[in-house]
């Protein structure tokens, strides 16, 4: 027997064909969401407050300080928030301290700071009753970047940019004359020496002393001449910079100084963030820049005077490691003192080394490091600017290297916590000005923190972020895998990211640093390809937001691959050579071969085993979760694998799903971490279990109650249904499955079914990827799914009185009311079809002048005789089913409703959808197709033992698509079915062809794994042997029921008066330009005329035609299409005098063209206007009558008084 048995959870054993020992379990798959939000609550929010506060008033007599904050209990539970369309959020209270510096008085107060949405355990947020996910964003990291460009003469020039988290950019560039310029905040360029002089190093000799003598420096100094002898060089430089930044304003050195300080050295205006400081120190540090260079002068320990490194030594990694403590300390440190007129007058500390130029052994080049400013320094420093200039000048000498902006060392991830923190920080800094003003204006004696803080903008910003940010998305809840994938999604779009139109080919492409960090397969097809990615299965974020992936460390001395796990970011990995996970190892853990396949800086080739530093932990660390669920992925073309991974996310949960016979072993982990199953939180023993709840008694005696969800509507309209897996008496451990979620079976992901599939054509019905299916799959509910739709009706107060929910609906027979209760609401369990009333509702009509008799009737019978319109909620087209639930919300019950709404009724209708012709099916290898015919079981081809085949696929769909994995799955699946086992064949480490054939042989199948099939209609065998087996097939969310649509009479667009388009708007089919050409080609003038008039936008014409048809009269001539009038109006709005002339060149008023029409044909809007007018008249008459009554009454009173 090939393979070995592996236990997945407590309910499933699979025979696994993997050969590689897994040394590291998969991390929790949704930790990217949960860890980030936890960090935000633990310290992120505190840091945001500390960044903005304390705030002082303009006279510095008052100060507002931040003390701390507390998050209280949420107002609603999770379930209540879902039901009431509320947000699952908790109130946050912040403690502030207000200090009066004149009197020394301190007021401390707790201020309510709004409700903050709280993340659920599943990594989602409930916002207004809907489950949402904040997608992590992939952005360019702050730091310093160097690039090269070739001009039209083939000359290489370099550029450099310092990009902060927020603040002004600082750029360097050289031109064709070898002069170096700098740009501040994208303005006009100035020689870089001007900026150096402004920093306080004004003399030419000082500049040569700092940077050394090079052609670029010399040319720039010559260009940068002293123009005004009245000013010092520093003042002149400052004025020149000011002129670039604020052209047209009077320039002084002082104003320039304060402007530069604000632009670069003020922490409130310029922020590198921790990650920016880390990246700058890493790039400008001398350690990385000295690597493999020849030192030109001896390195001497400044304390002892001993020579650490002789001149002429090549600085290899081992040499640098030996003096690392000195390089991090004071070795070759030089302090430069800027002159008094400089922007920043503090001493500038640099590290300065001289090395031999790589291009010319006789030249010496100066390398300047920024001497590693402290991590807490979040602004750029003069040392950073000088070190950046030095790196830039070194590039021309062949030292250093340019950056690749698509490298994952230069792109980082902003997860939920950081995105939220940025939003809050933005609003707090806006609030700061407001607070300052209030502190200055109001009376200091009575001022309290509560009075000066306005929380409205902050709460509004948080609300807006969750409600309408591009990164806050409605959760994709088709099935648990799609939920999981959505939580692990990384998007390069969104605020501060890229836009679809600007993103080029390079950004979207797979980069070598994606290995183990981002999946090279799973990305959408279409305009977002490569911009939206998925985290790889082992990917993990470090504190700076860079993606790390785990490797096994190789002991260089002994050559043993240890089980020590090291997590590396992309730029750390560049320094090492990494062997693949499938490299063979000896018993003692050393490499079995002298040469192994490995990677170094993106080069995949064979490397000697003795230079390997690390080894992959698992073959599946390259791919994402959905991709890791595709068996035999290694045998599929990547384009088809992409479709396979994406289509698994569109699978519809079935009534009784089956886990695949041929899995990858990933199904258990994906189901466990998806959040759709019920997982035990503690060890214990089951004391009660039914379909609604499970009770588990812990060892300490406390009781855990787990509620099981039954047929809840998911975001995608599928049934979210959980099934209890445990029974009374079972012992459960923490992390065990208590109940399966939707699309799960025995604790494993089960997106589809295991039908018997044959690759053969049948009467041409599987032409072009179509799928032929046996009726058994319909009758036995194999591919039946339940769909729930939600409909709501609300009653509002109108001008003419309140709307009412009632059984008494005008002009409706008793038959239509048979399933409504006494309130007029449908009963649960009623079967409804389109057009049936779900909620009976009437709206008051405008009442005309009432006669005395009518007023009498009103007085006797109350509202019965009042004029009302029927505005009931009815079942829309194609939505028939069974009423699953009804929810009623009223103000009386304390439900929060929108203003003006008195009552809200929600009706849930469940539909049981069997598979039918037109539904889309797919395998896991990108082999998708539409069901073209459902054949009776007796007509389907059958196997020699009499088993009929379930599905027939076209064999021509395989060779050109190159997804051979489906054929391997087919054969192995048949063997698994025959042997009665489940199989795991992990990606890149699955069953080899030897394993496959030995399993086929073990199952007693023929050696070619094919079989003879018999025609079900004739009983004759088919000519050739056919590949028949078991393939995992899923039903996708693209169902024909949702797409079928027809219109006869329906709504029209307001402006053009043409019929709307699309099923959602109940629109028509567009008869476009090309279709009109077709009619013109046939000369079908009458058809053409009615297509362009009655059936489109001739308003009067279509009303007349409708009337003529109903009354049996001849159809009148059409009028002028509305779109023609729209065109005329548009031309007139552009100032063109557009008129219509008749045969006698007399101007025709456009509305004259429609004269001769019957006056009784009225535009819909006219009807509304007439109604409104009638209502207003009725109201006016009523008011007049009331006034008359009042005057009469007054007159009577007066008369009485006089008597």
UniProtKB/Swiss-Prot annotation:
Residues 1177-1203 are annotated as: Disordered. One of its GO terms (cellular component) is DNA-directed RNA polymerase complex. Its EC number is 2.7.7.6. GO terms for molecular function: DNA binding; DNA-directed RNA polymerase activity; ribonucleoside binding. Gene3D superfamilies: 2.40.50.100, 2.40.50.150, 3.90.1100.10, DNA-directed RNA polymerase, beta subunit, external 1 domain (2.30.150.10), DNA-directed RNA polymerase, subunit 2, domain 6 (2.40.270.10), RNA polymerase alpha subunit dimerisation domain (3.90.1800.10), RNA polymerase Rpb2, domain 2 (3.90.1110.10). It comes from the Bacteria. DNA-dependent RNA polymerase catalyzes the transcription of DNA into RNA using the four ribonucleoside triphosphates as substrates. The RNAP catalytic core consists of 2 alpha, 1 beta, 1 beta' and 1 omega subunit. When a sigma factor is associated with the core the holoenzyme is formed, which can initiate transcription. This is DNA-directed RNA polymerase subunit beta. It comes from Streptococcus pneumoniae (strain Hungary19A-6).
